[in-house]
Amino acid sequence: MATNAHICIVTGSHLCRNPRVVKEAGALDEAGYDVTVLGPVFNDDLRAEDRALLTETAWDHRASVDLRPCIEGTWARLRRKIGTHWTRWGGESPHALGYGVASTLRRARSIGADLYIGHEEVGTWVVRQLLDEGARVGADFEDWHTRDLLPKDRVGRPLGLLEDVERTLLRHAEHVTTTSKALAQAMASTYEAPVPTVIYNAFPWADREALNETPRDRDGSGRPSLHWVSQTIGPGRGLETLCRALQDVERPMQVHLRGQCRPDYHDRLDARFPSENGHDLFVHDLVSPDELLGRIAEHDVGLALEQYEPESRNRTITNKILHYLLGGLAVVATDTDGQREVADKADGAVRLCAPDDSDELARQIRHFVRSENSLERAQSDALRAARETFSWEQQAPRLLTSIETVLR
């Protein structure tokens, strides 16, 4: 290892919304590297959440752009708006990728790191520019940015610029990682590039030490509990299919959804939800990253209802399915390429169904809740899969090996 080598991680999100960056920074810091994370400040609330995370870290965090009310924030928002409009009119502007791309590049350049690692659209664009300037760079593709939206949603997205970033970094960056074998192989094939190192989006097994048995979500009825989590509760996330499936599940269930939900969509869910079958629906706000595992672990079955489209969603492995395993939940997941990869390594912990197939979803839910033995076996398999494969303790060595190869 290159002792005291300085690594700068560049991202376009807050730490509290970017656990992969937090885990990466922590692993590199523990390995002896000097680590700086460069990312934006959107508002005071998210900044406070970031600071809470940083109380237990030794690595440095710096603002790439401050979007709170100030001249810098106003200018960054204006450039983003102009860049998006320009792209919609047929141009290609990096400012359409996110806020503060120019200031992020300028501040990254001033750090003078031995290695820069780009995350998300802004971060990967920045390290692409630094590569041209002779810097040593790496990239993490948590998503396939050119294929992470449906066609109707790509207006204003600078796809040509993103393709250049992906192609160049996959071919020429010295350290490239992604979240699944399915995504790694697809991107490598598309760009005729080396296959990236796969680092699963896992969480530390040690996080289980903080779990307690005090329920915060469950209603105390003893009914089996289903849990679904995402940043946003809304259409196109499998919830309508879940409502149809529960019509064919005779055993009364409690269903817990966690995320930001608009009142009008909450009303639509209530209207669809089959409460006449004895099921109850609970909608919870998001909680801090430190609280999430404890909330997940209260429940019996986790729902990972991803879609085949866009392609990035089909190929990647999201945080939620691995968080469910770490929480000791049986999992019902749609059979995307990424989630098949998890199911293959998780024995009987994960049952698969096609997206929008309510009959099969109902059958897989019934499989887990038909008896205590069925559920306990699946939950035991989930914990074993988390401990042996899908935990950060198992994934971090792959990251460190790749970095050591670059900096030796």
Q: What residue spans do the PLM features occupy?
A:
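Conserved donor-binding/catalytic core segment of Leloir-type glycosyltransferases
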Residues: 217-247, 256
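Conserved acidic donor-binding segment of nucleotide-sugar-dependent glycosyltransferases
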Residues: 345, 350-358, 367-373
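Membrane-proximal helix-turn-helix segments that form the acceptor-binding/catalytic region
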Residues: 24, 95, 99-110, 125, ...
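Nucleotide-activated donor-binding/catalytic signature segment of Leloir-type glycosyltransferases, i.e.
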Residues: 223, 259, 266-296, 301
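Carbohydrate-associated surface elements
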Residues: 182, 199-202
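Short hydrophobic beta-strand element within catalytic cores of glycosyltransferases
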Residues: 301-304, 323-326, 330-333
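A short, well-ordered alpha-helix in the C-terminal region of glycosyltransferases
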Residues: 367, 374-389
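Glycosyltransferase donor-sugar binding loop
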Residues: 42-44, 254-269
